[in-house]
Amino acid sequence: MQRADVVIVGAGHGGAQCAIALRQNGFEGTITVIGREPEYPYERPPLSKEYFAREKTFDRLYIRPPTFWAEKNIEFKLGTEVTKVDPKAHELTLSNGESYGYGKLVWATGGDPRRLSCQGADLTGIHAVRTREDCDTLMAEVDAGTKNIVVIGGGYIGLEAAAVLSKMGLKVTLLEALPRVLARVAGEDLSTFYQKEHVDHGVDLRTEVMVDSLVGENGKVTGVQLAGGEVIPAEGVIVGIGIVPAIGPLIAAGAAGANGVDVDEYCRTSLPDIYAIGDCAAFACDYAGGNVMRVESVQNANDMGTCVAKAICGDEKPYKAFPWFWSNQYDLKLQTAGINLGFDKTVIRGNPEERSFSVVYLKDGRVVALDCVNMVKDYVQGRKLVEAGATPDLEALADAGKPLKELQY
């Protein structure tokens, strides 16, 4: 049976960063990364942006050149999944039937796209935007003449895909079940702004609509039927309604968790010598009032990976990384600092009509998060307000001409 001192399951951002950080921190033991996809680790965010728009080729998305991993003596088993974890024996069962032993195990599998459960969900022409294969398949259909696309889901993935497809000249309809887009992650001001932007760019954006079924001919999707009976023509459908944490084998092995694998402040699961990081890990977040949650971002995956690598190397410290996020749509750059969970007030800096503004979120008078649209200085300086739990004067906070760094922390 093969064995490695550290086995990392998942070859995304978190898994790659953990392997890199192990070597950076002097780890000399054996490292194996097990990845479901056939590719070496690559950046995910550009899939729904630059790669989809053909502004970047795939070779520019690699987190490190493929030769890097061999140079650092990091082994990869690609195109492979873990189907079973035996925490007592410190042993994994792989999808090819092999067994693989580990000293420490890092679970970095992220999540699988949540799929529709309605009639017609198994038709061809229905896509997620999670992997290179997802995007390549959709791009091939566009090249073959697809003109009408329906995007189901008004989160960041759906909005980014809609923006790219609209710029490419396709007819895009975006459907959101809630009263506004980004309802789960942003305040009403930001939602209203992005809804207007997409409509102004030609997207048929509809909120408070429910999908009844997908209709098709000869096994291929041809439309989306709404609960009211209307059928929207669609030669392709993108589903962006969230992810389901890929944690089955760990939960089956006895790990605590439900919506993600529960980890402590050191990213340790309830099973011995097993860590979990990234989108699949649920932890008590200091920047969300200690609420247990999963944070789906590159920043979180990378920083958790580094935290675990340092712990394995003997430098164990609690995970306290500052959360941040970004999204590019059209010529708009959104930068988010902090987590706005439970906010009770917002302050607008700048003018949304000028397409350059910030939304500051407060809870009990303290700054907890910012959404900055084409306002880089606000983002950079506002991070410190969030980190400090600042209680600034609201009139000064609303003055876009006053730098955030000048406000009382």
Curated annotation (Swiss-Prot):
A molecular function GO annotation: oxidoreductase activity, acting on NAD(P)H
Which cysteines are cross-linked by disulfides? none
Q: EC number(s)?
A: 1.18.1.3
Per UniProt, the keywords (alphabetical) are: FAD, Flavoprotein, NAD, Oxidoreductase
Pfam families from the entry? Answer: Pyr_redox_2 (PF07992), Reductase_C (PF14759)
Q: Has keyword 4Fe-4S?
A: no
Give the required cofactors.
FAD
Catalytic activity, reaction form = 2 reduced [2Fe-2S]-[ferredoxin] + NAD(+) + H(+) = 2 oxidized [2Fe-2S]-[ferredoxin] + NADH
What role does it play?
A: Component of the dicamba O-demethylase multicomponent enzyme system involved in the degradation of the herbicide dicamba. In vitro, catalyzes the transfers of electrons from ferredoxin (DdmB) to NADH. Both NADH and NADPH support enzyme activity, with NADH being markedly more effective than NADPH.
Assembly behavior:
Monomer. The dicamba O-demethylase multicomponent enzyme system is composed of an oxygenase component (DdmC) and an electron transfer component formed by a ferredoxin reductase (DdmA1) and a ferredoxin (DdmB). In vitro dicamba O-demethylase assays in which DdmA2 is substituted for DdmA1 demonstrate that the two enzymes possess nearly identical activities.
Q: Which family does it belong to?
A: Belongs to the FAD-dependent oxidoreductase family.
- The molecule here is called Dicamba O-demethylase 2, ferredoxin reductase component
